């Protein structure tokens, strides 16, 4: 077993060796620009790019012409949300999203608010899922876009996107879905979900960093305002020379996910349950954050009451985990996702996100269980609050001298 152990698969995944092998020729031998139409170097690059486009499209049930290459999911989210809102603003300026979305969507929405759009930020249920009835009630005559993710990046909780898609389609409202954490791990089909726009990322499915895609529906055609000016690449949606090796890697990663994803999900789910049951057997006052029934297979987001998440992360420093999203973990604020689920600030501060994936082993899971149980017990020994609770004191009845 190699130390350190990687259990942060929602932040990024290692590039699969088969993906790397597919990419290598496009760095030095077949190095052409896919937009160079006048010679064989360009033709070979373009051929590879189009083959990858087919693979990514097949993974999500789309046609290749509906896949637009980007630099990653953040760009895909920005292009979808801002591009659609700006194009369709003559029909209305009301947008709907959810309080637990990724920052790339939330901050795009805030940027649009500054441009005069009105945004409704929906609450989620205690289990982290969006109740479709809340969405239905929020739609108005001037609503033009709904943006709801498929699976949450912190809790792994899966929203009922098929039902959401039926509601938006019936209302004639565009539906953008951030499918970054689900594509390749769960079945995700743009037709089944009535999705009009979907964000995808290579590095969340064992592909390279710095390459993403945006699915843009053609029937009925969805229009966007480009967010970057330039040579009009990608049918005018996204200018810029294509990252050919990265795109080839994305294509291979998508192919592997399509062929092996179901079997892999089963294996990873068994490992996740082994981790959960092991922690549960060794510790009390342990809370799983978010629905277990509706969740990506490799996610376990747990709060260890009376233990600071940051302190536990330092105590298990040879295990790579996170306390929240990698995009916001520089902040010491408790996770906004957990707070939106109604989880107390103290419990949110004590949360750890374990992300398991393709290269996680049983041996690693068992080692992590032993280590976490040992360190949580040790940290709780230093907690007077934990001691009081064990002695039967109801902390909610205590009047503190200096309430924090």
Curated annotation (Swiss-Prot):
Q: Positions modified as N6-(pyridoxal phosphate)lysine?
A: 204
Write the Enzyme Commission number(s) for this entry: 2.8.1.7
Catalyses: (sulfur carrier)-H + L-cysteine = (sulfur carrier)-SH + L-alanine
Please give the InterPro entries that the UniProt record associates with this protein: Aminotrans_V_dom, Aminotrans_V_PyrdxlP_BS, Cys_deSase_IscS, Cysteine_dSase, PyrdxlP-dep_Trfase, PyrdxlP-dep_Trfase_major, PyrdxlP-dep_Trfase_small
The prosthetic group or cofactor this protein requires is: pyridoxal 5'-phosphate
Does the keyword section mention Iron-sulfur?
yes
Q: Where in the cell is it found?
A: Cytoplasm
Q: In which pathway does it act?
A: Cofactor biosynthesis; iron-sulfur cluster biosynthesis
Q: Which PROSITE patterns does this entry report, sorted A to Z?
A: AA_TRANSFER_CLASS_5
Q: What class of enzyme is it?
A: transferase
Which keywords label this protein? 2Fe-2S, Cytoplasm, Iron, Iron-sulfur, Metal-binding, Pyridoxal phosphate, Transferase
Q: List, in alphabetical order, the GO biological process terms annotated in this UniProt record.
A: [2Fe-2S] cluster assembly
Q: What does this protein do?
A: Master enzyme that delivers sulfur to a number of partners involved in Fe-S cluster assembly, tRNA modification or cofactor biosynthesis. Catalyzes the removal of elemental sulfur atoms from cysteine to produce alanine. Functions as a sulfur delivery protein for Fe-S cluster synthesis onto IscU, an Fe-S scaffold assembly protein, as well as other S acceptor proteins.
Q: Which family does it belong to?
A: Belongs to the class-V pyridoxal-phosphate-dependent aminotransferase family. NifS/IscS subfamily.
Q: What is this protein called?
A: Cysteine desulfurase IscS
Q: What is the scientific name of the source organism?
A: Anaeromyxobacter sp. (strain Fw109-5)
- Organism taxonomic ancestry: Bacteria, Pseudomonadati, Myxococcota, Myxococcia, Myxococcales
């Amino acid at each position: 077993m190699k130390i350190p152990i990687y259990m942060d698969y929602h932040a990024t995944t290692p590039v699969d060796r088969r993906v790397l092998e597919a990419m290598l020729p496009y760095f030095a031998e077949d190095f052409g620009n896919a937009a160079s139409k006048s010679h064989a170097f360009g033709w070979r690059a373009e051929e590879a790019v189009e083959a990858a486009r087919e693979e990514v499209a097949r993974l999500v049930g789309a046609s290749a012409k509906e896949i637009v290459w980007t630099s990653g999911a953040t760009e895909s989210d920005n292009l979808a949300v801002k591009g659609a809102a700006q194009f369709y603003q003559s029909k209305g300026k009301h947008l709907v999203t959810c309080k637990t979305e990724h920052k790339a969507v939330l901050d795009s929405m805030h940027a649009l608010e500054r441009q005069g759009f009105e945004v409704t930020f929906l609450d989620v249920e205690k289990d982290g899922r969006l109740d479709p009835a809340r969405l239905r009630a929020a739609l108005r005559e001037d609503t033009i876009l709904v943006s709801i993710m498929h699976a949450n990046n912190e809790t792994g909780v899966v929203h009922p996107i098929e039902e959401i898609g039926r509601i938006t389609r019936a209302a004639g409202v565009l539906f953008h879905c951030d499918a970054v954490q689900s594509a390749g791990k769960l079945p995700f089909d743009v037709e089944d979900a009535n999705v009009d726009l979907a964000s995808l990322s290579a590095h969340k499915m064992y592909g390279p960093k710095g390459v993403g895609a945006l699915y843009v529906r053609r029937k009925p055609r969805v229009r966007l305002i480009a967010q970057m000016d330039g040579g009009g690449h990608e049918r005018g949606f996204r200018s810029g020379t294509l990252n050919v090796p990265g795109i080839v890697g994305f294509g291979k990663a998508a192919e592997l996910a399509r062929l092996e994803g179901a079997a892999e999900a089963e294996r990873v789910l068994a490992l996740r349950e082994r981790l959960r049951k092991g922690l549960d057997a060794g510790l009390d006052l342990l809370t799983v954050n978010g629905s277990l029934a509706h969740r990506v297979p490799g996610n376990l987001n747990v709060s260890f009451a009376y233990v600071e998440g940051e302190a536990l992360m330092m105590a298990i420093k040879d295990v790579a985990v996170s306390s929240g999203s990698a995009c916001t973990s520089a902040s010491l604020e408790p996770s906004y996702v957990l707070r939106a689920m109604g989880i107390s600030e103290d419990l949110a501060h004590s949360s750890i996100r374990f992300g398991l994936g393709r290269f996680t082993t049983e041996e690693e899971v068992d080692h992590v269980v032993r280590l976490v149980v040992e360190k949580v017990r040790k940290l709780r020994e230093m907690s007077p609050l934990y001691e009081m609770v064990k002695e039967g004191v109801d902390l909610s009845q205590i009047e503190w001298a200096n309430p924090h």
